[in-house]
């Protein structure tokens, strides 16, 4: 089974990527990283897109600026693919 790691999974791009991957109906698990602690809005947005099967998704709250935490996560998850979609949610913060 393939393990797909998505950073920024609860953001706009993460939601659309997750929806697209689940629609492919392939044998994989999705491990999402989010700085958010409330995942309900993420699942509600997936429902609006027509995704109702969340069995392949596991979301973790991890600090991506902590190298040791990220190294441990990579060892534990052993991802076959990584999509890095994390970043500031404000244009002003990204300047």
Positions of PLM-derived features:
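N-terminal Rossmann-like NAD(P)+-binding domain of SDR-like oxidoreductases, especially those catalyzing
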Residues: 1-95
């Amino acid at each position: 089974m393939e393990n797909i790691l998505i950073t920024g999974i609860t953001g706009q791009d993460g939601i659309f990527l997750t929806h697209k991957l689940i629609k492919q109906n392939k044998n994989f698990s999705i491990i999402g990283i989010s700085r958010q602690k409330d995942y309900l809005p993420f699942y509600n947005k997936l429902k609006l897109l027509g995704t109702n099967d969340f069995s392949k998704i596991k979301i973790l709250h991890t600090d991506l600026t902590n190298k040791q935490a990220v190294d441990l996560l990579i060892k534990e998850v052993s991802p076959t693919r990584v999509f890095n979609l994390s970043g500031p949610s404000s244009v002003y913060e990204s300047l």
